[in-house]
């Protein structure tokens, strides 16, 4: 009977990944609101650090660990009915949406901009803005499911990544 109940439960329950998340080597994104920088962790190293814009006030850009749920090229701006690719579109060249505050990845995201001069400043309504060429690179680098950590921290990206198991310290790497 126990076997039967366990079998039924396994068939109707979602399949969860086994082990730690992220796995060593998986892409991982860290946004530091204190410095307005974004780091990409890839293959156990910081692959790149980019200047970004975050919320006008500290509470607008949510903090926590989220997952990329949607990606779009030349995203449509629904709020003002602006087609993707338009020079008037504030979302720029790419949209990388994540599930902050229980949303579906269409409210909060990392995106390009039509105001390149705003990058590096505290000016957004909660999203993370990047230069268009840099968000295109990020878009190509990270898949849906990538973890995104948004924090306000005075530590280095390496220290933050080690704490969140996105980087393994050299002495912790097993020798085969």
Curated annotation (Swiss-Prot):
Pfam families: YkuD (PF03734). Its EC number is 2.-.-.-. One of its GO terms (molecular function) is peptidoglycan L,D-transpeptidase activity. The active site is at 111 (proton donor/acceptor), 127 (nucleophile). Residues 1-25 form the signal peptide. This is Putative L,D-transpeptidase YqjB. Keywords: Cell shape, Cell wall biogenesis/degradation, Glycosyltransferase, Hydrolase, Peptidoglycan synthesis, Signal, Transferase. Pathway: Cell wall biogenesis; peptidoglycan biosynthesis. Residues 27-151 form the L,D-TPase catalytic domain. SUPFAM superfamilies: L,D-transpeptidase catalytic domain-like (SSF141523). It comes from Bacillus subtilis (strain 168). GO terms for biological process: cell wall organization; peptidoglycan-protein cross-linking; regulation of cell shape. Belongs to the YkuD family. InterPro entries: LD-transpeptidase, LD_TPept_cat_dom, Transpep_catalytic_dom.
């Amino acid at each position: 009977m126990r076997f039967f109940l366990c079998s039924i439960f396994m068939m109707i329950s979602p399949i969860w990944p086994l082990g730690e998340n992220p796995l060593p080597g998986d892409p991982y994104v860290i946004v530091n609101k204190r410095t307005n920088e974004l780091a990409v962790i890839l293959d156990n190293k910081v692959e790149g650090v980019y200047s970004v814009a975050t919320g006008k006030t500290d509470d607008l850009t949510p903090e926590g660990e989220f997952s990329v749920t949607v990606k779009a090229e030349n995203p449509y701006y629904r709020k003002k009915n602006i087609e993707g690719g338009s020079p008037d579109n504030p979302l720029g060249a790419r949209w990388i949406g994540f599930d902050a505050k229980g949303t579906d990845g269409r409210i909060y995201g990392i995106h390009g901009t039509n105001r390149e001069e705003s990058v590096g400043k505290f000016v957004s309504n909660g999203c993370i803005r990047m230069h268009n060429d840099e968000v295109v690179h990020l878009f190509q680098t990270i898949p849906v499911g990538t973890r995104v950590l948004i924090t306000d921290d005075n530590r280095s990206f390496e220290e933050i990544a080690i704490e969140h198991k996105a980087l393994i310290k050299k002495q912790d790497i097993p020798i085969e």
